[in-house]
């Protein structure tokens, strides 16, 4: 039986815009090894700054833990267009190789170059058209997943369920259409490198 590989993890580098996480990269990696994981991906919130520290520690532990793998990723904010008052959906990207990491850097640079302030916070989204354009040159080198409850798939599915519970079939259909459009976009953009994130939870939603 294959051991678990954690594909969605945050470190203190996710605090670049707001307080989000207290994990130091070294501590997170050590804990993953202690738990018997086969590896983890570092996916901070629109931040690649921790990757150098992660790589340095990966080299340090390579001899003692040769089978433990560390992947480098980014949790981006994916939107249809940049405008105030929108939902900034979370989306996970993980580099499969050095070429994929170059794609992550290009996407992150695009997001930060076009940053703006909305509701008192600096926002750093990337649009779907920008993501699709960049990935047209890097397909096969980046893994994508739907992320957490902050992702578009989870949000739309949750809202569809709420609409169905009150028999609001019009809204439910709209959320269903949103899910279909989102899934088609992801499959077209990432092909077989697109995955749906599943997370255990005791929360009712």
Spell out what each predicted region is.
Residues 1-205:
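Phosphodiester-processing cores and adjacent nucleic acid-binding clamps
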């Amino acid at each position: 039986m294959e051991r678990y590989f954690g594909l969605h993890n945050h470190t203190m580098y996710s605090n670049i815009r707001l307080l989000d996480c207290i994990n130091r990269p070294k501590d997170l990696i050590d804990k993953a090894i202690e738990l018997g994981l086969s590896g983890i991906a570092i996916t901070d919130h629109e931040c690649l700054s921790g990757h150098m520290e992660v790589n340095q520690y990966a080299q340090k532990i390579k001899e003692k833990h040769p089978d433990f793998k560390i992947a480098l990723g980014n949790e981006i904010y994916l939107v249809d267009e940049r405008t105030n008052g929108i939902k900034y959906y979370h989306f996970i990207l993980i580099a499969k190789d050095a070429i994929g990491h170059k794609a992550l850097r290009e996407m992150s640079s695009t997001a930060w170059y076009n940053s703006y302030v909305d509701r008192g916070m600096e926002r750093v989204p990337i649009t779907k058209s920008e993501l699709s354009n960049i990935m047209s040159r890097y397909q096969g080198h980046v893994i994508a997943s739907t992320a957490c409850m902050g992702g578009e798939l989870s949000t739309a599915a949750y809202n569809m369920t709420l609409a169905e519970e009150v028999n609001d079939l019009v809204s439910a259909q709209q959320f269903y259409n949103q899910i279909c459009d989102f899934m088609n976009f992801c499959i077209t953009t990432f092909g077989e490198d697109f995955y749906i994130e599943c997370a255990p939870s005791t929360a009712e939603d």
